[in-house]
From Swiss-Prot:
Major localization class: cytoplasm
Family affiliation: Belongs to the peptidase C2 family.
Keyword Metal-binding applies: yes
Cofactor note: Binds 2 calcium ions.
Native source species: Homo sapiens
SMART domains on file: calpain_III, CysPc
Protein name: Calpain-8
Catalytic activity: Broad endopeptidase specificity
Keywords annotated in UniProt: Autocatalytic cleavage, Calcium, Cytoplasm, Golgi apparatus, Hydrolase, Metal-binding, Protease, Repeat, Thiol protease
Length: 703
């Protein structure tokens, strides 16, 4: 329940601008300025209670408490490591990024690329901090997280061994911005060890809020050089790596001194005149620093002697910093994949710079409710979250073209908070999405999920080529104008997870989550049915009614259990007393806590209707319905509910094996009827909103 309330609170805060880079969320409620002032007033250096300098901050396995790798580690402040520590020395540069004993080269490559764009850098690394004025042992950084910016506060105690920083450090021994940035990112993800292993674009996106694309260099686009050049000019961040065929090859060094599975950052491209012909060059950087490419165009390679000496002086900087040049043709041969985090994605496909429009959806895959798996599982696939976008305006550069006009969209599906789960053995889920064009007759269909039959009848217009266990999968699609349904999913069903779905479109797109409507029109027996004489029913009622001709919750329990216990077509262990109390609460019109004959007859007819729906929805006649079938049952019962409510129902009423027995089903129906009835009574002006005091709200939810 607390999670649902927190989600509602976040949504309301976002509508008021909270979560922008200028108004970042305070991670764990810590405010940098307030905490720093408290430390300055008290004369005490900050010690972060939320990320203490202790073994748990290091890791949980290889860097866990008691691990040989963590023996001898001492946490020290920069003021204890050198006489005159500096936050940044001479501006932040790529050489400030030197890898330590943590396998987070992917992150370091992203940080190195970040230094190429000062505006981006200082969004992540605020300028208002140093070791001189107002120093209080506290620093702060900002990161993009799933659609919103968060401010992370840390103290400056860093893990050291033998007097040296253990992890990320700068070539300048007295410069600490990069080490502190790594610590803040470790805090955001739970610990340092959680940063081991990843994709460079993950860091790119968390530093910029951009969206990433991947290029397979075994099948490079013909205009690869132009793509890279324009991306760098647009301030985009680029990384590349060499794939390995087995774990044994990881970090292996090739004969020409390239490190396999290592994350390199792309820092520049140039074209030179080489022996009378243009030669395209690309500049890369290895965060390790010590290992550099030894092939053509490397430091001291003979190729440099055959170009204009002035160009050679400009480009050939002989520094052992891990940065080097190579030809574009060698780059394509040697590397496997290129990753680009687009800050202005349209600059890659058009000479003109346009501001793309962004639509952001947040959602959950909840086991038993909205975790339907991929198209290989048609029985549950349709229960995945569904989002609709409408594309009306075609791309500008195609409005006058002869071919079919199209709308370019860039889709990115990102799973949330998976690094936190590494410590409990849960890695990234395999995720993907599919895009379906909505037929004209269904374009106005937004109140409920499209069902199984739709997905059996229609094929996707665009989709991820494969499901992969990366934090984000993304891709471009060129679609004719129209209405489209986007379905994000995990590969296998019943996998819990959170996600955000981003849709960039060149022209503005209308967006709506399918099934976002909440409404209820439950079955009400006709008065003639209630008034109809039934001798058997009357004898049953009189048998358990008291002298006042009223039935209590205990009597109701006995009566109903006796009536339904003989059925063999449903699994029924009996109604519990709380369900019976809910029944009375719904129909007790005079507040006595009991039911009269007419009220009981109404209840009896409702339960018969619930039984009919339950039996119809139990497609495999197992005697129970599963949580995915519950969505259909609710619709049959007259309830239109959004995904959040569906997920809450699955969490509350389904058992561990995702089955819902008849008692739980009836309890859910009764509870929903009660809540809709209460809301309708309180919503006097019928605007879909009610305002209650705390006492009034408690009385309602405790009914």
């Amino acid at each position: 329940m607390a999670a649902q309330a927190a989600g509602v609170s976040r949504q309301r805060a976002a509508t008021q601008g909270l979560g922008s880079n200028q108004n970042a969320l305070k991670y764990l409620g810590q405010d940098f300025k307030t905490l720093r002032q408290q430390c300055l007033d008290s004369g005490v250096l900050f010690k972060d209670p939320e990320f203490p300098a202790c073994p748990s901050a290091l890791g949980y396995k290889d860097l866990g408490p008691g691990s040989p790798q963590t023996q001898g580690i001492i946490w020290k402040r920069p003021t204890e490591l050198c006489p005159s520590p500096q936050f940044i020395v001479g501006g932040a540069t790529r050489t400030d990024i030197c890898q330590g004993g943590l396998g987070d080269c992917w992150l370091l490559a992203a940080i190195a690329s970040l230094t190429l764009n000062e505006e981006l850098l200082y969004r992540v690394v605020p300028r208002d901090q140093d070791f001189q004025e107002n120093y209080a042992g506290i620093f702060h950084f900002q990161f993009w997280q799933y659609g919103e910016w968060v401010e992370v506060v840390i103290d400056d105690r860093l893990p050291t061994k033998n007097g040296q920083l253990l992890f990320l450090h700068s070539e300048q021994g007295n410069e600490f911005w990069s080490a502190l940035l790594e610590k803040a990112y470790a805090k955001l993800n739970g610990c340092y060890e959680a940063l081991a292993g990843g994709s460079t674009v993950e860091g790119f996106e968390d530093f910029t809020g951009g969206i990433s694309e991947f290029y397979d260099l075994k099948k490079p686009p013909a205009n690869l050089y132009q793509i890279i050049r324009k991306a760098l000019c647009a301030g985009s961040l680029l990384g590349c790596s060499i794939d390995v065929s087995s774990a044994a090859e990881a970090e292996a060094i090739t004969s020409q001194k390239l490190v396999k599975s290592h994350a390199y950052s792309v820092t520049g491209v140039e074209e030179v005149n080489f022996q009378g012909h243009p030669e395209k060059l690309i500049r890369l950087r290895n965060p390790w620093g010590e290992v550099e490419w030894s092939g053509a165009w490397s430091d001291d390679a003979p190729e440099w002697n055959h170009i204009d000496p002035r160009r050679k002086e400009e480009l050939d900087k002989k520094v052992e910093d891990g940065e080097f040049w190579m030809s574009l043709s060698d780059f394509v041969r040697q590397f496997s994949r290129l990753e680009i985090c687009n800050l202005s994605p349209d600059s890659l496909s058009s000479e003109e710079v346009h501001k793309w429009n962004l639509v952001l959806f947040n959602g959950h895959w909840t086991r038993g409710s909205t975790a339907g798996g991929c198209q290989n599982y048609p029985a549950t696939y349709w229960t995945n979250p569904q989002f609709k976008i409408r594309l009306d305006e075609v791309d500008e550069d195609q409005e006058e073209s002869i071919g079919e006009p199209c709308c370019t969209v860039l889709l990115g599906l990102m799973q949330k908070n998976r690094r936190w789960r590494k410590r409990i053995g849960q890695g990234m889920l395999s995720i993907g999405y599919a895009v379906y064009q909505v037929p004209k007759e269904l374009e106005s269909h937004t109140d409920a999920h499209l069902g199984r039959d739709f997905f059996l009848a229609y094929q996707p217009s665009a989709r991820t080529s494969t499901y992969v266990n990366l934090r984000e999968v993304s891709g471009r699609a060129r679609l004719p104008p129209g209405e489209y349904l986007v379905v994000p999913s995990t590969f296998e069903p019943f996998k819990d997870g959170e996600f955000c779905l981003r849709v960039f479109s060149e022209k503005k797109a209308q967006a709506l989550e399918i099934g976002d409507v909440v409404a209820g029109n439950p079955y009400e027996p006709h008065p003639s049915e209630v008034d109809q004489e039934d001798d058997q029913f009357r004898r049953l009622f009189e048998k358990l009614a008291g002298k006042d001709s009223e039935i209590t919750a205990n009597a109701l329990k006995i009566l109903l259990n006796e009536a339904f216990s003989k059925r063999t077509d449903i699994k029924f262990d009996g109604f519990n007393i709380n369900t019976c109390r809910e029944m009375i609460s719904l129909l007790d019109s005079n507040g006595t806590g009991t039911l009269g004959a007419v009220e009981f007859k109404t209840l009896w007819l409702k339960i018969q209707k619930y039984l009919e729906i339950y039996w119809e929805t139990d497609y495999n006649h197992s005697g129970t319905i599963d949580a995915h079938e519950m969505r259909t049952a609710l619709r049959k019962a007259g309830f239109t509910l959004n995904s959040q409510v569906q997920q809450t129902i699955a969490l509350r009423y389904a058992c561990s094996k995702l089955g819902i027995n008849f008692d739980s089903f009836v309890a859910c129906m009764i509870r929903l009827e009660t809540l809709f009835k209460l809301f309708s009574l309180l919503d006097e002006d019928k605007d879909g909103m009610v305002q209650l005091s705390l006492a009034e709200w408690l009385c309602c939810v405790l009914v």
